[in-house]
Amino acid sequence: MSRRHAAEKRVILPDMKYNSILLSRFINNIMKEGKKALAEKIVYSAFNKIEKKHRVDPYQTFNNAMHNVKPHLEVTSVRVGGANYQVPTHVDERRGYALASRWIINAASKRSEKMMIDKLAEELFEASNNRGVAIKKKEDTHKMAEANKAFSHFSPKKMK
């Protein structure tokens, strides 16, 4: 692994329908085995289902869900004197949204509905209303960071 310079961040184009880079990243996370058209179909169909069932703007619901699930703190493992400590660190915005989308997708796939469209629609709606498994995951992460607040003086190098 080269240490000369950091890798360049790829430019991700916004999605066609809502012109949003955040939604485009979410679609890329849904995508499996390069089947982007299928991932787009799942997301846009879930948006249609949200609009029909709950009579709310699906894009606004998506943004609210992502904002509600995005963590502000997480713990990173730091080795000090032969012992590993779970040190709470702040999460930057890009990583926060990446974690949020991953948690929403995992929570949706574990739901009991039959089709991924239904699962995703319900999980997004619940997350936008501060309910659901993805919100619980965020709260657990924050509790873990709060419990390990005593080790915050062992901040990792990236925080200095």
Curated annotation (Swiss-Prot):
NCBIfam families: rpsG_bact
Source lineage: Bacteria, Pseudomonadati, Pseudomonadota, Alphaproteobacteria, Rickettsiales
Function as written in the Swiss-Prot or TrEMBL entry: One of the primary rRNA binding proteins, it binds directly to 16S rRNA where it nucleates assembly of the head domain of the 30S subunit. Is located at the subunit interface close to the decoding center, probably blocks exit of the E-site tRNA.
Family affiliation: Belongs to the universal ribosomal protein uS7 family.
Biological process per Gene Ontology, one example term: translation
Keyword RNA-binding listed: yes
Record-linked PROSITE patterns: RIBOSOMAL_S7 (PS00052)
Gene3D superfamilies: Ribosomal protein S7 domain
Protein name listed in UniProt: Small ribosomal subunit protein uS7
Keywords linked to the UniProt accession: Ribonucleoprotein, Ribosomal protein, RNA-binding, rRNA-binding, tRNA-binding
Quaternary structure and partners: Part of the 30S ribosomal subunit. Contacts proteins S9 and S11.
GO cellular component, one term: small ribosomal subunit
